[in-house]
């Protein structure tokens, strides 16, 4: 199955997206690193503009997602009934912090998605651990957008193993 995800950074792009058949509209501050958070105001505006669209939001670039500001943002975005929240897994040292937020936050109907980075502390052994903690899905991305692609960074064996999980 092929699906189309389009990242948007502002309300003007959301208006354009409203005229096109897009499977998932991803709210992302592209000027703020790999998973820049657009802010709750834009999340609210886009949800009002596109109430029937499938929306995802990147939740920022915190190494430790279990911090007061991120938890506050997560809860506000969940209250807006966004379909998917993308939370970055930037550092293996913070694996247990992901478990804490997944257990402590009521995600209601919002699905938390863990974003692992092929070019930053990637460890295939963590995929099953992250799913067991409560992530609804795992995706692989690149953290440094001007570096190599996922196909350059991971072996075919790693990609096949990831797809089997």
Please give the residue ranges for each predicted region.
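N-terminal-biased segments
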Residues: 23-34, 114-132, 136-144
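Active-site-adjacent beta->alpha loops and helix N-cap segments on the catalytic face
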Residues: 31-51, 65-70, 89-109, 120-125, ...
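Catalytic cores of alpha/beta
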Residues: 9-20, 59-80, 119-133
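Glycine-enriched alpha-helix->loop->beta-strand junction motifs that scaffold or abut catalytic
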Residues: 20-25, 50-52, 78-84, 106-111, ...
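N-terminal entry module detector
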Residues: 1-31
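Alpha-helical scaffold elements within enzyme catalytic domains, especially in hydrolases
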Residues: 16, 49, 76, 104, ...
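Conserved, mostly hydrophobic/aromatic
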Residues: 17, 46, 138
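Hydrophobic faces of well-ordered beta-strands that scaffold small-molecule active sites
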Residues: 4-8, 25-27, 55-61, 83-87, ...
